[in-house]
Amino acid sequence: MKVTVIGTGYVGLVTGACLAEMGNHVVCLDVDARKIRILEEGGIPIHEPGLEAIVARNRAAGRLQFTTDVAASVAHGTLQFIGVGTPPDEDGSADMQYVLAAARSIGRHMTDYKVVVDKSTVPIGTADRVRAVIAEELAARGMADTAFAVVSNPEFLKEGAAVEDCMRPDRIVVGADDERAILLMRALYQPFMRQSDRLQLMDLRSAEFTKYAANAMLATRISFMNELARLAERVGADIEQVRRGIGSDPRIGKHFLYAGTGYGGSCFPKDVKALIHIGREHGVELQVLHAVESANERQKHVLVDKVVACFGADLAGRTFALWGLAFKPDTDDMREAPSRVVVDALLARGARVRAYDPVAADEARRVLGDRPGLEFAASAADAARGADALLLVTEWKEFRTPDFDGLKAALKQPLVFDGRNIWDPALLAQMGFEYHGIGRAGG
């Protein structure tokens, strides 16, 4: 099947590469010539395990192409995926300019039937706006009778596991009201559903809502567990034991029950804000989501609060090792990362920060800038050397079983703040460390 994907960011590139992997002929369009040049030279602008290999393989096979040619891209695919960004505006609403610009380009260049697929996370009712924009462009060209359909097909990709999620989806949500489009979408996704039919067909607005509802629910679980962790510390309970206890209930499940330093990234913060804004537009105050957002912002300060409790408010002359900068493992994404809050707060109190991340260091340098008191270490061991304490912010696998003897010798004092509860407090205490976790007894 011939497919066009508009946008070569996180969503567009992963979607295009995985569709090509299943034998489709995919053209990925982007107006950013620099990004297209990088892709054509074999570069990958984002860190995502498995993506580089799948892109290279399908480019070599001739199934995946990159271009800035709008007219040729629109002509290529019957299916036109829109996978551009929807960044938040100042009021929390999703900025729709890129989605509508893509729709307008399709309307300006299409000459036959197209299925326009909204893959980006978009506000409820976007399909109607996309349809109106395309119809307006067709009418201006005297082609008002040209048939097309608009479909909502939200992505449910986890950064760090996006290729796996795309190739083996747990569900495929399709919102559509056009039978021809439904048949084409089912045919496109049939190779992804050989073991069971995972396609969930619904109306357009329900499909658009499903994406926001899913991310809001996951963000709620994270903030709820972080709230319980704060209480656990006060009452002498261990949130890790509580997590296992409640996660064994099948009505609750084991996922997204980990206390930590708060959520970040490109999706949860943006989508919670957008859903709050949508609710307000329709006269519904989503009070739970307000609390989720507030709790998450507070949680990003929890590690520094613990540092202050140990060292006092004035941290001048102190150096802290920081392990992990990306908002989660297996990505270089620094958007809304808790580490940004931690670094800002430590520097504001006069401390020096020596940070290490196995993947996100370059992106962190770009985001955090060249600031007095901040340096980037070449390894976890280098970051810890001579530091007053270690703060673990992102749970990269290489941090799970470090050389604790070497770490103890490297630090001025054996003091660790475990922001992701990946270490065993009893084991570290036995080894002579002072341990502070999130929601751990004595934490």
Which residues are covered by each model-predicted region?
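Structural/interface elements that position substrates and couple domains in central-metabolism enzymes
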Residues: M1-G443
